[in-house]
Amino acid sequence: MGSSDQATAHARAQAASARLFDDACAVIPGGVNSPVRAFTAVGGTPPFITAARGCRLTDADGNHYVDLVCSWGPMILGHAHPAVVEAVAKAAASGLSFGAPTPAESELAAEMIARVAPVERIRLVNSGTEATMSAVRLARGFTGRAKIVKFSGCYHGHVDALLADAGSGVATLGLPSSPGVTGATAADTIVLPYNDIDAVRQAFTEFGDQIAAVITEASPGNMGVVPPAPGFNAALRALTADHGALLIVDEVMTGFRVSRSGWYGIDPVDADLFTFGKVMSGGLPAAAFGGRAEVMERLAPLGPVYQAGTLSGNPVAMAAGLATLRHADAAAYAALDANADRLARLLSDALTNAGVPHQIPRAGNMLSVFFTDTPVTDFASARATQTWRYPPFFHALLDAGVYPPCSAFETWFVSTALDDDAFDRIAAALPAAARAAAGADEGNS
């Protein structure tokens, strides 16, 4: 089959998704409700997913894919896990939302507190953005200070104060920040290079009595996977404590994914506040922030820092989260680690055989593919990689029935549901994908 025939066949295979995308673009800005889903970084039409089970996705055209995105992290047990589906159905049968306290809220909060030792109180919210926004407000209210330190390439949701030089979709689209963020808001945000503890010391030297908090991803995964240098998070803890500022560790991505206790189980730094999302709600919309009782009890109704949400603690989302966490046992985390090891080996072998420079950094069972010979340690080195190799690599995998992240700056996620057949498909797809990356032309990026 010639290249034109392949293009025609692929167009036919995506015809239903293409129609759905056109329909979506008529009513939704860009046709998507989160920018990275539009395939801007890789080109082409995004498949419209109609079903998922285990480690496999099905799109509107009937194509099947091995899922290496896992809804951007939360689906650690795979899609439609029977215990999670049963818990959701049972909760939904009793009512979808009450706007009142429910037992499941306290049960999920207690489960999370039992896993992360420094967390003494939890407040449930609806999204990771809401969690980080609320944690920042609480830090300012607790300290009486205004400035927040964040790191270039770390993404903490689309909070105005935290969008400056952020990762995730902001990096994918090549945006330095976002219009609509006022100068006054930006002025209270200090953006520093990631993994540069000397820069943090200098910021405290200049602004120490004005800094309310330092916020960092526990192990960043929104500029690709860029783990903290050994001791970096602990040094942040020491500096914030010395200057009366709070440390906020964002575990929205890593929380309860990379271990039973999230990144805290790997690098146990006692932050003042943590934010959580994704895994804790089993794929439904819920998130949380929590920390020391002394700090958390400044929240209304106990204290003056206001935070509220009509759907916070939604009983159906709580049921999904509880079922997910209760089935995420030691065997599940061992399987996640083994599957990440297996995927990383397959990726590295294929890229090595094709002569493609690459790094595959890991944060527990999270990983990334960077096209470079040089280790990536911060946002600058992530952006300096050969990202133009990624679109042909991505599309070769997608065409072969493997669904990887649609940006070089996003994380690859595994689930416990990956089986030998799935890995066989990945292994069969990778040589051609690696050759496509090897033959990529920077001028066509």
From Swiss-Prot:
List modified residues, type N6-(pyridoxal phosphate)lysine: 278
Name a GO CC annotation attached to this entry: cytoplasm
What is the annotated localization of this protein?
A: Cytoplasm
Reaction(s) catalysed by this chain, per the record, are: (S)-4-amino-5-oxopentanoate = 5-aminolevulinate
InterPro entries, A to Z: 4pyrrol_synth_GluAld_NH2Trfase, Aminotrans_3, Aminotrans_3_PPA_site, PyrdxlP-dep_Trfase, PyrdxlP-dep_Trfase_major, PyrdxlP-dep_Trfase_small
Q: In which pathway does it act?
A: Porphyrin-containing compound metabolism; protoporphyrin-IX biosynthesis; 5-aminolevulinate from L-glutamyl-tRNA(Glu): step 2/2
Keyword Cytoplasm listed: yes
Keywords, A to Z, come to: Cytoplasm, Isomerase, Porphyrin biosynthesis, Pyridoxal phosphate
User: Annotated Gene Ontology MF terms?
Assistant: glutamate-1-semialdehyde 2,1-aminomutase activity; pyridoxal phosphate binding; transaminase activity
Q: List the disulfide bonds.
A: none
Q: Which CDD domains match?
A: OAT_like (cd00610)
Is NADP set as a keyword in this record? Answer: no
User: Which EC number(s) are documented for this chain?
Assistant: 5.4.3.8
Name the major location.
cytoplasm
Cofactor(s) listed in the protein's UniProt record = pyridoxal 5'-phosphate
Name of one Pfam family that matches: Aminotran_3
Which proteins does it associate with, and in what oligomeric form?
A: Homodimer.
Family membership noted in the UniProt record: Belongs to the class-III pyridoxal-phosphate-dependent aminotransferase family. HemL subfamily.
Listed name of the protein: Glutamate-1-semialdehyde 2,1-aminomutase
Q: Which organism does this record belong to?
A: Mycolicibacterium paratuberculosis (strain ATCC BAA-968 / K-10) (Mycobacterium paratuberculosis)
